[in-house]
């Protein structure tokens, strides 16, 4: 039977000093021997998705104590990708994921915690904590801060649902007046919580439900709604229960690697494809699988993307649909329920809260449950009042959205498209693959060919787009923005937003070895692997080269013969695979350390230390 890890520091004569220090934190004689649970919080006043988390860590801690555990809270960093966007701050976003994972490992292992509750929310925080949970493999429960309410605004007599991306697009559109831009800006992000569409943060919080590591409703219950409090309360009790099951009953089924197995990762990816999640989720799922030593690769994602249909379209793919609408339609358990009806998930995977995922779906899918408690839970609605306070309103929808033919969530028989919301493309420009969010691509450009407009950085691409140097029919190529080449693999939300503002959202393609914000839509192809800095073919593209993109057939091809590519490669080898133009970019020691070990996106941009 496994011993409680914490007894390393709480038992034995030689631990008198450690116990003395524990006592100084408030522990008493009766606490030594109880499971010590780390409450891993990520509160910060920099990020709207985390600004309301300050007191929630202590809420969980009180419930842990009430359940017979000892709670010890610490904090991780949290970067706001939206605020860091469009300048060198974005170089730090993806590397912060590794810092978060490492910091959780450092604190948990240094103090010998027995289990942990991870309170996350935004883009890199949930992935970083997920990586840590799979790396440490101690009992863990995830509970996120929840999504923001969508903005609402009346412009010229018409009501619009808004999010962050609308503010960015409006600001870059010369046809939108300064007055209207200000109105949109003030209305786009009305409450605390993760940005309101199916962007990276919400996508990842939804995936924790499919992985079995969080409670039903974690991905879709609004941050402001009183119903969300129950998730934090239950997480506190649940973690003590599963910690005892592992340490006192030797039940390894409650460990993260037992719950988040390869089959669970396939369930999560099937969900991601069905709901048209952010392309960043691919990066993070691969990284989490790597930490858990799970054999889950781009080939698995490609296989799943060919058989799982798109069952939901949420902003940015469908501008007037947000997470509050997904919740009203039954949330993630109902999307999983539709996949289950189509035989597209594994029902037998365990979860932290139910014996199997199938049991959870049967209880929580609003189209199959008879529980009025469950149905009432999914009636939780936005309050429509700007606030930074969690659980501050209790509005309800009058009716649920159970329309599986034309509603927010569709059945397998009535999908938005038979092809899923994400696809892996391969070809000579992306030998190890690249990712496109097909849910955000207009049907008219699923096949696209055009001449390359090559930019050596996001900054130069933005200047070129705003200066009208990009024309309809062009394929914008942004390179040397990968994990190593950036470094840090910047998001390209500004280039795609500016293409939209110029009326080119359905007339151009954009490919990059960088990545995209979850708020990106259009023919935006990212994660091109190998990246330019690693000798990838994207580094050989020249101005005017023709590029053919065929999403239905999953191909992307640079129309240059092999002999010419070989000659260009020899030339680049001599130059050391660096950008042609000098970039005004300060790469600090911290960023250099990340770049030294970062792999390309097809491996999740994890660090390769040569030990695997």
From Swiss-Prot:
Query: GO biological process: what's one of them?
Result: isoleucine biosynthetic process
Q: Which residues carry this modification: N6-carboxylysine?
A: 124
- Give the top-rank taxon of the lineage listed in the UniProt record for this protein: Bacteria
Name its co-factor(s).
[2Fe-2S] cluster; Mg(2+)
Leading EC class: lyase
Q: List residues binding [2Fe-2S] cluster.
A: 122, 195
Which pathway, metabolic or otherwise, does it act in?
Amino-acid biosynthesis; L-isoleucine biosynthesis; L-isoleucine from 2-oxobutanoate: step 3/4; Amino-acid biosynthesis; L-valine biosynthesis; L-valine from pyruvate: step 3/4
| Annotated binding of Mg(2+), by residue | 81, 123-124, 491
Classification via PROSITE patterns:
ILVD_EDD_1, ILVD_EDD_2
Q: Which GO terms describe its molecular function?
A: 2 iron, 2 sulfur cluster binding; dihydroxy-acid dehydratase activity; magnesium ion binding
InterPro entries, A to Z: Dihydro-acid_dehy_C, DihydroxyA_deHydtase, DiOHA_6PGluconate_deHydtase_CS, ILV_EDD_C, ILV_EDD_N, IlvD/EDD_N
Q: Active site annotated at which positions?
A: 517
Name the UniProt key words of this record, in alphabetical order.
2Fe-2S, Amino-acid biosynthesis, Branched-chain amino acid biosynthesis, Iron, Iron-sulfur, Lyase, Magnesium, Metal-binding
GO CC terms, sorted? cytosol
Report if keyword Magnesium is assigned: yes
Cofactor binding notes: Binds 1 [2Fe-2S] cluster per subunit. This cluster acts as a Lewis acid cofactor.
Reaction(s) catalysed by this chain, per the record, are: (2R)-2,3-dihydroxy-3-methylbutanoate = 3-methyl-2-oxobutanoate + H2O; (2R,3R)-2,3-dihydroxy-3-methylpentanoate = (S)-3-methyl-2-oxopentanoate + H2O
What EC number(s) is this enzyme filed under? Answer: 4.2.1.9
Q: What does this protein do?
A: Functions in the biosynthesis of branched-chain amino acids. Catalyzes the dehydration of (2R,3R)-2,3-dihydroxy-3-methylpentanoate (2,3-dihydroxy-3-methylvalerate) into 2-oxo-3-methylpentanoate (2-oxo-3-methylvalerate) and of (2R)-2,3-dihydroxy-3-methylbutanoate (2,3-dihydroxyisovalerate) into 2-oxo-3-methylbutanoate (2-oxoisovalerate), the penultimate precursor to L-isoleucine and L-valine, respectively.
Xref: NCBIfam families: ilvD, PRK12448.1
Which protein family is it in? Belongs to the IlvD/Edd family.
Fill in the subunit field for this protein: Homodimer.
Q: What is this protein called?
A: Dihydroxy-acid dehydratase
**What is the protein's species of origin?**
Sinorhizobium medicae (strain WSM419) (Ensifer medicae)
| Species lineage | Bacteria, Pseudomonadati, Pseudomonadota, Alphaproteobacteria, Hyphomicrobiales
Gene for this protein?
ilvD
